[in-house]
Swiss-Prot record:
UniProt cross-references to Pfam families, sorted A to Z: p450
Function: Catalyzes the 3'-hydroxylation of the flavonoid B-ring to the 3',4'-hydroxylated state. Convert naringenin to eriodictyol and dihydrokaempferol to dihydroquercetin.
Naturally occurring in which organism (per UniProt): Arabidopsis thaliana (Mouse-ear cress)
Cytoplasmic side of membrane: 22-513
InterPro entries noted in UniProt: Cyt_P450, Cyt_P450_CS, Cyt_P450_E_grp-I, Cyt_P450_sf
Domain of life according to the entry: Eukaryota
EC number: 1.14.14.82
Gene assigned in the entry: CYP75B1
Tissues showing expression: High expression in siliques and to a lower extent in stems, flowers and senescing leaves.
Protein name, as recorded: Flavonoid 3'-monooxygenase
Length: 513
């Protein structure tokens, strides 16, 4: 124990010495750093973050303004908390902030930065991004898997009809639907249900463990001199999980390769396998097995909880605002009718539903703080010096509630996005910086198109197909809307409801009615 304490003490002293020299070398810039709360010795501003850092950082804007400087351990962190500041970082200086800072999760679980989400900005990242855009998330690719999403959403609606008067945890059922759809699109397997095999069970449990580990604060990421000690055992758990995950993905990859032409382009993995050995960039660049596995890992971890939690929040908001629910249902009844279920191609003709979903993204972004970026070089933003190596966080949640951008920012008002509304031309695809739930710039979410389709289609289906009543006699105005902070912004209390079918049984695929 004494040896461990001495090691920590020596490592800390060494870092303090290095920081003193760094301070002297850069002292001409220090008075130009963005403002922020005074850091504590060693741990910096970590104690200031609290359990809901997006809210804590938003509150700091009142005191320090829309660009903040923090010290988390020994890491310089800059927070963008307004539309104009975010645009400076992610548009004007986008190239300088196109890489990610080092972190234990990417190192130990995401194939040592060989994935798309955490890969350094450069040639290999551009190649992976091109593969994703052209082969996985293009309009054609999304259309090819449209039937999968329709089938899984149909399964969900039939289950909701069959529950009768029993209450259901809506978020849980929606999550199962999204996981099954993505599992079939990715690897040709459902992960929930009677036809899910033992490999699917294993995969699902590993994803759950990975999401939990990725949300753990690892002190080694912020005090690098302590990283090798793995004081919390986080790195060890990540390494063991990665070993299991890699074995699973390797077996699935081998199975697909053995099936050869029989499985060509039947799922995303077979598409990726077909690209192996192909010159993808005109310079001999091809896709490796490791990169294929890393891409699968990215798609599954990024695409499940985010979509499911967003739909869960949307239905909760509509239950709280029955007048808005009625308007959305009336639009669906007029455009689609009650004789068939809504499908993805109908969404373009449902402007009010689209406005509801935009407003839901505004108040409940799936990731309230962006994934971190790193400054490749020092630069100046709004007159402040941003040191090389600084970590950038964009407070997506705070920007979307900024009273300088939004009238009545805490109210749920889809009309603001309709023609004549204050934000009628605003979209969620990264060009309007007051609303960037998928991020912006070069590192915008690669799966934006699939995620948006999934969320729109699921929400439309649940609105068209059912009226909703809260369980336990809870009234809409008493519905708990507290959030639980993590990798995604989940509801703190599950949304437990009674679904009441509003269409004929045959529309749900349950026979003539």
């Amino acid at each position: 124990m004494a040896t461990l304490f001495l090691t920590i003490l020596l490592a800390t002293v060494l870092f303090l010495i290095l920081r003193i020299f760094s301070h002297r070398r850069n002292r001409s810039h220090n008075n130009r750093l963005p403002p922020g709360p005074n850091p504590w010795p060693i741990i910096g501003n970590l104690p200031h973050m609290g359990t809901k850092p997006h809210r804590t950082l938003s509150a700091m804007v009142t005191t320090y303004g829309p660009i903040l400087h923090l010290r988390l351990g020994f890491v310089d962190v800059v927070v963008a908390a307004s539309k104009s500041v975010a645009e400076q970082f992610l548009k004007i200086h986008d190239a300088n902030f196109a890489s990610r800072p080092p972190n234990s999760g990417a190192k130990h679980m995401a194939y040592n930065y060989q994935d798309l989400v955490f890969a350094p900005y450069g040639h290999r990242w551009r190649l992976l991004r091109k593969i994703s855009s052209v082969h996985l998330f293009s309009a054609k690719a999304l259309e090819d898997f449209k039937h999968v999403r329709q089938e899984e959403v149909g399964t969900l609606t039939r289950e909701l009809v069959r529950v009768g008067t029993k209450p259901v945890n809506l978020g849980q059922l929606v999550n199962m639907c999204v996981v099954n759809a993505l599992g079939r699109e990715m690897i040709g397997r459902r992960l929930f249900g009677a036809d899910a095999d033992h490999k699917a069970d294993e995969f699902r449990s590993m994803v759950t463990e990975m999401m939990a580990l990725a949300g753990v604060f690892n002190i080694g990421d912020f005090v690098p001199s302590l990283d090798w000690l793995d004081l919390q055992g986080v790195a060890g758990k990540m390494k063991r999980l990665h070993k299991r995950f890699d074995a699973f993905l390797s077996s699935i990859l081998k199975e697909h390769e053995m099936n050869g032409q029989d499985q060509k382009h039947t799922d995303m993995l077979s598409t990726l396998i077909s690209l192996k050995g192909t010159d993808l960039d005109g310079d001999g660049g091809s896709l490796t097995d490791t990169e294929i596995k890393a891409l699968l890992l990215n798609m599954f971890t990024a695409g499940t909880d985010t979509s499911a939690s967003t739909v869960d929040w949307a239905i909760a908001e509509l239950i709280r605002h029955p007048d808005i629910m009625v308007k959305a249902q009336e639009e669906l009844d007029i455009v689609v009718g009650r004789d068939r279920p809504v499908n993805e191609s109908d969404i373009a003709q449902l402007p009010y539903l689209q406005a509801v979903i935009k407003e839901n993204f505004r108040l409940h972004p799936p990731t309230p703080l962006s994934l971190p970026h790193i400054a490749s070089e020092s630069c100046e933003i709004n007159g402040y010096h941003i040191p090389k190596g600084s970590t950038l966080l964009t407070n997506i949640w705070a920007i979307a509630r900024d009273p300088d951008q939004w009238s009545d920012p805490l109210a749920f008002k889809p009309e603001r996005f309709l023609p004549g509304g204050e934000k009628s031309g605003v979209d969620v695809k990264g060009s309007d910086f007051e609303l960037i739930p998928f991020g912006a710039g070069r590192r915008i979410c690669a799966g934006l198109s699939l995620g948006l389709r999934t969320i729109q289609f699921l929400t439309a289906t649940l609105v068209q197909g059912f009226d909703w009543e809260l369980a336990g006699g809870v009234t809409p105005e008493k519905l708990n809307m507290e959030e639980s902070y993590g990798l995604t912004l989940q509801r703190a209390v599950p949304l437990v409801v009674h679904p009441k079918p509003r269409l004929a049984p045959n529309v749900y695929g349950l026979g003539s009615g």
